[in-house]
Amino acid sequence: KAPNTESIVEYSKTHEKALVDFFVKVEMNRAIEQLQKEYSMVVMDNLKSDLNVMLNAPANFTYYKDTTDFFWSSNNANTGRMDLIVYTFPYTDPNTFTEEYLVAKRDSVLKANLPGSFPGSYMQTETRAGVEYTPITLNGKYCGVMRGLWRMQGDMMGGPFVSHTRLDEKNHRVVVAEGFV
């Protein structure tokens, strides 16, 4: 218990990053626990059989598109729509894990696999707003986290995305899992 309001304010200012990190971690763990209990078997089964990737997506993710090295799933909701993509590509260069390379790869994969509703329209990274790339360690392994905005070239859609990029050493490939709204 804090002795007074001023000490709470001072503590919060002094330990701002630690407090934010704590609440983010607690919320992430809550979401992980929920996804371990209830998840989309459609997504899990298709990713496991086609890309040899295990991923728990929310249970309401049922609509999907599956091609070689690319998987897309959505809750297909009229409001509160969420999408998930997973794609892989061969690991050939240590420079793969840079913001520039991953944005270029993302754009080429999305252009080929997520066309818009109008001819010639496609999804791409909105680089004018800036993209944030952060290397982290996840379960003892390197992971690149990219956050930014996407837009539909030739159409009027867009929103935020977060992607996690990891090296699959066993299969000599890079695996990207991304969520966007």
Whereabouts are the PLM-identified features?
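N-terminal "mature-domain start" segment
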Residues: 36-65
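Charge-rich, low-complexity N-terminal segments
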Residues: 24-34, 45, 76-81
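Secondary-structure transition/turn motif
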Residues: 75-78, 149-151, 180
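Short, surface-exposed beta-strand/loop "edge" segments at domain boundaries and coil↔beta transitions
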Residues: 5-9, 79-83, 92-95, 153-158
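Secretory pathway targeting signatures of secreted, lumenal, and periplasmic proteins
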Residues: 58-117
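Signature of long, low-cysteine stretches enriched in small and polar/charged residues
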Residues: 1-2, 6, 112-172
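Short, well-ordered beta-strand elements
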Residues: 2-7, 83-88, 172-180
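Surface-exposed amphipathic alpha-helical segments
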Residues: 10-33, 55, 61, 172-181
